[in-house]
């Protein structure tokens, strides 16, 4: 699932397209549909996700809906990969700083390294999804 604040929609759409081409199934509100009830749509997207990729920015941190998605993902035990969308002048604080503390960020603020950073994101997603599948296999036995 791709969680983002709408100011970064064009960049996240580009990430969606690249990950999809690499074989990653992604959920993005404008691509996958939110449904009539935004909160039900968000909850379903998080509940059905193996990992939530949160595209962090100052406006993301200020968004009540982004906060709900990330907190619900954390409470549901869904893995999270933070992606930094801002330059070096901003860092997450408050609820977002707490939830992402200790996480390895992918940085998408530098356009010149976009493809390299997408490969890093792809590797992190593969690592988390692979670990989730291994846990499911063990619990099924």
Regions found by a protein language model. Name each.
Residues 1-21, 64, 85-141:
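C-terminal interaction surface of TIR/SEFIR-family domains
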Residues 3, 29, 54-57, 83-84:
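Conserved beta-strand segments of the P-loop GTPase G domain that flank and frequently precede/overlap
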Residues 14-44, 56-67, 104-113:
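Conserved BB-loop
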Residues 26, 80-81:
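Hydrophobic anchor at the start of a short beta-strand
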Residues 34, 58-78, 88-94:
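Conserved TIR/SEFIR loop-to-helix hotspot centered on a Trp-containing motif
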Residues 42-46, 95-97:
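Short glycine-biased active-site loop of nucleotidyltransferases that positions the nucleotide triphosphate
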Residues 49:
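An anion/phosphate-binding loop that grips the pyrophosphate of nucleotide cofactors and donors
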């Amino acid at each position: 699932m791709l969680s983002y604040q709408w100011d970064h929609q064009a960049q996240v759409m580009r990430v969606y397209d690249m990950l999809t081409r690499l074989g990653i199934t992604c959920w993005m509100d404008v691509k996958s549909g939110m449904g009539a009830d935004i909160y039900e749509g968000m909850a379903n997207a998080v509940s059905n996700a193996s990992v939530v990729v949160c595209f962090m920015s100052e406006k993301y941190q200020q968004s009540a809906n982004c906060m709900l998605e990330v907190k619900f993902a954390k409470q549901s035990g869904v893995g999270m990969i933070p992606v930094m969308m801002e330059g070096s002048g901003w860092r997450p604080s408050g609820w977002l700083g707490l939830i992402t503390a200790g996480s390895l960020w992918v940085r998408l603020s530098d356009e010149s390294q976009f493809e390299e950073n997408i490969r890093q994101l792809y590797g992190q997603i593969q690592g988390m999804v692979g670990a989730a599948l291994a846990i499911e296999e063990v619990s099924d036995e």
